[in-house]
Amino acid sequence: MTRKQRRLTIIGGALFVLAVAAGLVLNALRDSIVFFSTPTMVAEKHIGPGKRFRLGGLVQPGSLKRGDDLAVTFEVADGGAKLPVAYKGILPDLFREGQGVVAEGALDAAGVFKADTVLAKHDETYMPKEVADTLKKQGHWKDDYGKPQAAKPGPVSMREGEKTAAGATQ
């Protein structure tokens, strides 16, 4: 074997090893790359009990039930499917029915998602992209989804002296 053939063999072998390593890394990260799975995706993937993942969607209105010792159950929906969630702990301040949520945990044998972490949305206009796309595709999308509700104006009355004093301080 000449020097040139040996060099090409070594370079080809190194490229092959790098390609195999990249393939193994991408295969291992395949499920981790997705930030969360929607209930429809969970049903399609047939995720088995005990496998940890993130579940995202909207808290189904009327599904929130509080139990003893901070135990809470609710359903997460994406417009196509619903998944029951059980959580024991303090819920975030922004958590409420009809709002976006991401929970981390695993399914149990009964098909209930046992969450050990629950995150509520931060932005008033937030809706997971997959949920919005699913709602649009199924024809359930409403233009007011994801928009903040305006607060009801209360009675405001200022006397003339207070108006000028308030205007002077601004």
Curated annotation (Swiss-Prot):
<feature type="compositionally biased region" description="Basic and acidic residues">
    <location>
        <begin position="137"/>
        <end position="146"/>
    </location>
</feature>
<dbReference type="Pfam" id="PF03100">
    <property type="entry name" value="CcmE"/>
</dbReference>
<keyword id="KW-0735">Signal-anchor</keyword>
<keyword id="KW-0479">Metal-binding</keyword>
<keyword id="KW-0201">Cytochrome c-type biogenesis</keyword>
<protein>
    <recommendedName>
        <fullName>Cytochrome c-type biogenesis protein CcmE</fullName>
    </recommendedName>
</protein>
<dbReference type="GO" id="GO:0017004">
    <property type="term" value="P:cytochrome complex assembly"/>
</dbReference>
<dbReference type="GO" id="GO:0005886">
    <property type="term" value="C:plasma membrane"/>
</dbReference>
<feature type="transmembrane region" description="Helical; Signal-anchor for type II membrane protein">
    <location>
        <begin position="8"/>
        <end position="28"/>
    </location>
</feature>
<dbReference type="InterPro" id="IPR012340">
    <property type="entry name" value="NA-bd_OB-fold"/>
</dbReference>
<feature type="topological domain" description="Cytoplasmic">
    <location>
        <begin position="1"/>
        <end position="7"/>
    </location>
</feature>
<feature type="region of interest" description="Disordered">
    <location>
        <begin position="137"/>
        <end position="170"/>
    </location>
</feature>
<feature type="topological domain" description="Periplasmic">
    <location>
        <begin position="29"/>
        <end position="170"/>
    </location>
</feature>
<dbReference type="GO" id="GO:0020037">
    <property type="term" value="F:heme binding"/>
</dbReference>
<keyword id="KW-0472">Membrane</keyword>
<feature type="binding site" description="covalent">
    <location>
        <position position="122"/>
    </location>
    <ligand>
        <name>heme</name>
    </ligand>
</feature>
<comment type="similarity">
    <text>Belongs to the CcmE/CycJ family.</text>
</comment>
<keyword id="KW-0349">Heme</keyword>
<keyword id="KW-0408">Iron</keyword>
<keyword id="KW-1003">Cell membrane</keyword>
<feature type="binding site" description="axial binding residue">
    <location>
        <position position="126"/>
    </location>
    <ligand>
        <name>heme</name>
    </ligand>
</feature>
<dbReference type="InterPro" id="IPR004329">
    <property type="entry name" value="CcmE"/>
</dbReference>
<keyword id="KW-1133">Transmembrane helix</keyword>
<keyword id="KW-0997">Cell inner membrane</keyword>
<comment type="function">
    <text>Heme chaperone required for the biogenesis of c-type cytochromes. Transiently binds heme delivered by CcmC and transfers the heme to apo-cytochromes in a process facilitated by CcmF and CcmH.</text>
</comment>
<dbReference type="InterPro" id="IPR036127">
    <property type="entry name" value="CcmE-like_sf"/>
</dbReference>
<keyword id="KW-0812">Transmembrane</keyword>
<dbReference type="GO" id="GO:0046872">
    <property type="term" value="F:metal ion binding"/>
</dbReference>
